[in-house]
């Protein structure tokens, strides 16, 4: 998005406090949704005594999350509120490390893992992930490329986790 688009979006949310509150609430709820459902998935795997899948669904996502975190530090891409003269709607003091979005990476990774285990929850999380990506862009903390890369890498990490489980 460019400066004109961000300005229009910011002005809309500044004029409409209810919409602004909904945006912030959506950011918190969608983030929490993904992060609460991941331990639930692990608990389901544990209760089903699917230890091989449990190990794959813990170890590989952890390594991928670490790899994304290191990559973000190395690339150190500026955030929209650093590159453009805008105030982000989602308050964030962090500088750089915008690419890829770790929030979006995480929810798409968790969605893919759930999809491999139980499709309805996976589909729900994919939809939640799309909304989270939109919220993060509208909120001014990520560019579209950041969230698209996060989603793609999250799905890839989830598929790798499932593939490793299948070949073990």
Residue map of PLM features:
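N-terminal transmembrane-helix/juxtamembrane module of multi-pass inner/ER membrane proteins
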Residues: 1-37, 52, 68-96
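Membrane-helix interface segments
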Residues: 18-19, 49-53, 80-81, 118-123, ...
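Transmembrane-embedded, aromatic-rich helix segments that form part
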Residues: 36-39, 125
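Interfacial segments of alpha-helical transmembrane regions
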Residues: 39-67, 147
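Transmembrane helix-loop junctions and nearby membrane-interface residues
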Residues: 42-49, 73, 121, 137, ...
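Small-polar-interrupted transmembrane alpha-helices in polytopic inner-membrane proteins
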Residues: 59-72, 123-135
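Transmembrane alpha-helical segments of multi-pass membrane transport proteins and ion-pumping complexes
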Residues: 65-69, 73, 155-162
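Membrane-embedded catalytic cores of phosphoryl/pyrophosphoryl-handling enzymes
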Residues: 85-168
